Amino acid sequence: MNQNKMLELINHLKNAGFVFQGSEIYGGVANTWDYGPLGVLLKDNILNYWKKFFVFSQNNIYMLDSKILLNSKVWEASGHVGNFNDPLIENKINNKRYRADKVIEELFPNENVAKMTHEQMQEFLQKNVTSYDNSKCAWSEIKKFNLMFETFQGVVDDKKKAIYLRPETAQGIFINFKNIQRAMRAKLPFGVAQVGKSFRNEVTPGNFIFRTREFEQMELEFFFDEETPNSYFDELVNKSYDFMLKLGLSKNNLKVRKHDQEELAHYSKATVDLEYNFPFGWGELMGIAHRGNFDLSTHSKFSNEKLEYLDPNTNKKLIPSVIEPSVGLDRLMLAILCEAYSEEKVSESDTRLVLKLDKKLSPYKVAILPLIKKFNPKANEIYSYLIDKNISVTFDESASIGKRYRRQDAIGTYYCLTVDEQSLEDNTVTLRDRDSMQQERINFKDILKFL
């Protein structure tokens, strides 16, 4: 998919009810997007499969729902207050601000920006970038720009009352480690999974829903004893890659990239990114980080609470290490949509737009199409039957049957059931497959075998 197709996809997603510009009637807010009716269904299907794949498939993974607002000391302890920042630079000619590292990466993709200090970035830009973003350049000094959104609790605007919108969901898991382990009588190794909103005041958000200031994360923190021989890190990298394939992403559009030492976050011992080939280039889709015992050790120190684990077999106390597979739900959804968006030539004079979503992800698994209104009562009977079976189904009675097929193809509906005269006689319907467009006659209750 190229950039032009990307623009076509965005326009289609808006028209079809997947994604809308946030606050659109007031001129919008940059890089905010609302999920429409079909976007909500698709997002929920991705989320539910993530839970099935990473959580419910094992008996030692537990769910948590921690809050967006945490005690500010959490972020001081985690290092986010001191370390969670971007190198911000201003072009004094056009008065625009940019992330210095991203400007260099964009213009000089072979430069290893991760190894550069802020001073080296600034010197590099002043020497090599004399024009950018349709303007001549006079670069300011680089400043550290903290990515956390700050607000105040209570009625007094007092720095002592400062509180932050969380920039990641992980810390809510770490500070609840003791509660979860005790309540669930969990033995190492075990994991805690969480889904929730996070907020980062990004300097240069963009590329549709790939990078936004408000986003949703799906994270798993897998706790284990570092001294016990294991291959958990490699296993979770492989499991994460398999997860992407099962969502319908192509191997040709995926790559595994290990972070260099200079790239590692302050908490990380090792990190691997799964990257996807988006229309705008390769971008991180999922990160698997070996965080060691940094988080639990740091929170133990700052809170004076011992976040330890007592091994029931050896009576040994230890602070567990953790491996974290983390994925942004919004950018994963974008990758899936880029992969699925297709225009097919059906004949010399006819093309169709189709979202070839994996069956488990389709917003609607089935569309009920009465051939004419006379058949609506029977169609409603079939609709109610499938709803009772917890099947995601839609009802479409307007326009010709051909136009309705195309409409359902364009939103990813996997099967269409056409109700006609014969349906009234023997309960059969015409089943049409989205991808092959093949049709066959079945009893309407047999659709369950296809799902």
From Swiss-Prot:
Question: GO CC annotation: what is one?
Answer: cytoplasm
* Catalysed reaction equations from the record: tRNA(Gly) + glycine + ATP = glycyl-tRNA(Gly) + AMP + diphosphate
Alphabetized Gene3D superfamilies for the sequence:
Anticodon-binding domain, Bira Bifunctional Protein, Domain 2
**Principal location:** cytoplasm
Q: Which InterPro entries match?
A: aa-tRNA-synt_IIb, aa-tRNA-synth_II, aa-tRNA-synth_II/BPL/LPL, Anticodon-bd, Anticodon-bd_dom_sf, Gly-tRNA_synthase/POLG2, Gly_tRNA_ligase_bac, GlyRS-like_core
Any transmembrane segments, and where? none
Q: Which domain of life is it from?
A: Bacteria
Recorded hits in CDD domains, A to Z, give:
GlyRS-like_core (cd00774)
* E.C. no: 6.1.1.14
Name of the top EC class for this enzyme: ligase
Q: Which GO terms describe its biological process?
A: glycyl-tRNA aminoacylation
Residues bound to ATP are 200-202, 210-215, 284-285, 328-331
Binding positions for substrate? 99, 168, 215-219, 324-328
Q: What keywords would UniProt list here?
A: Aminoacyl-tRNA synthetase, ATP-binding, Cytoplasm, Ligase, Nucleotide-binding, Protein biosynthesis
GO terms of molecular function: ATP binding; glycine-tRNA ligase activity; protein dimerization activity
Cell location: Cytoplasm
Q: Which Pfam families match?
A: HGTP_anticodon, tRNA-synt_2b
The role this protein plays is: Catalyzes the attachment of glycine to tRNA(Gly).
Quaternary structure, from the entry: Homodimer.
Family that this chain belongs to: Belongs to the class-II aminoacyl-tRNA synthetase family.
This chain's protein is named Glycine--tRNA ligase
Q: Which organism is it from?
A: Mycoplasmopsis synoviae (strain 53)
Q: Give the lineage.
A: Bacteria, Bacillati, Mycoplasmatota, Mycoplasmoidales, Metamycoplasmataceae
